[in-house]
Amino acid sequence: MVVIRLARGGAKKRPFYNIVAADSRNRRDGRFIERVGFYNPMAAESEKGLVVNAERLEYWKQHGAQLSPTVLRLAKQAAKAAA
């Protein structure tokens, strides 16, 4: 099953997350199918902290991908900011 979830990157104490479509059997930070966006919780005011490709996210949802609870919250937040 395909899931859309966060893959952690960045350094110690400085998290950075890629929003990825991946097979549920793969590790959290392992192989993924496609990068759909990113989330930077430590972003400064002048930087973009959240970027989501809504078109690709919708594509994966239509093809049966399950969103993790955090990605669902972030997707709603990104849609609200874009509107």
From Swiss-Prot:
GO terms for biological process: translation. GO terms for molecular function: structural constituent of ribosome. PROSITE patterns: RIBOSOMAL_S16. It holds the Pfam family Ribosomal_S16. Keywords: Ribonucleoprotein, Ribosomal protein. GO terms for cellular component: cytoplasm; small ribosomal subunit. InterPro entries: Ribosomal_bS16, Ribosomal_bS16_CS, Ribosomal_bS16_dom_sf. The keyword Nucleotide-binding does not apply. Gene3D superfamilies: 3.30.1320.10. The keyword Ligase does not apply. Belongs to the bacterial ribosomal protein bS16 family. This is Small ribosomal subunit protein bS16. It comes from Aromatoleum aromaticum (strain DSM 19018 / LMG 30748 / EbN1) (Azoarcus sp. (strain EbN1)). The gene is rpsP.
